[in-house]
């Protein structure tokens, strides 16, 4: 069983205290091609491309132009699971997971990324900003199409080493579309979270993102390897709701 989640635009590069066996990014050649493309963009072009403020565009320009795709170590990079710090990662709280759970996560959790493609928890990453939905073409393909074959092939390879061949999709649609479901040789299971608002259940972005992190943590800490145990998730008031679920979707409501 492998979980996939989205990355986060917010990143924290404060050093971590615990020593781990860090790993290198999976798609180094593709990263070189992408970062070299991004380095062509001036500040004003980044502002328009990414629809961000002039100040943020300057920061992104600096990040990409100081990016060294041939060097990933503790001087310029940090393990991905401790670097991303958006809403999903607030739910995950990776810095409070014990060493054995982090090691387990290395084989059961993958983060999708516009720049890195697929990222394992202990892969070293440098600061960047490139959302999967960014309107940029690489080799004549939009970004998620550029990554699709590469990511799907790599996932199938990882699943060949897994006993339970289920992909738990906790990523957003923007990122999960970078996986070709038709070419994925395993079962695909979506998970959704809904809130009861005035008698109607709705998916609310900020709550759903944090819940994805909570679910990721729950699966990793409990070493869950089957769907029936996922249904037992009962954190932050969420409970499995069969009325909104089917064989390809588990929905949790509160």
Curated annotation (Swiss-Prot):
Q: Name one GO cellular component term.
A: cytosol
Q: Which PANTHER family match?
A: PEROXIDE STRESS RESISTANCE PROTEIN YAAA, PEROXIDE STRESS RESPONSE PROTEIN YAAA
Organism whose genome encodes this protein = Francisella tularensis subsp. tularensis (strain SCHU S4 / Schu 4)
One GO BP annotation here? response to hydroperoxide
Quote the Pfam families the UniProt record gives: H2O2_YaaD (PF03883)
Name of the molecule in the record: UPF0246 protein FTT_1693c
Q: Which family does it belong to?
A: Belongs to the UPF0246 family.
HAMAP family per UniProt: UPF0246 (MF_00652)
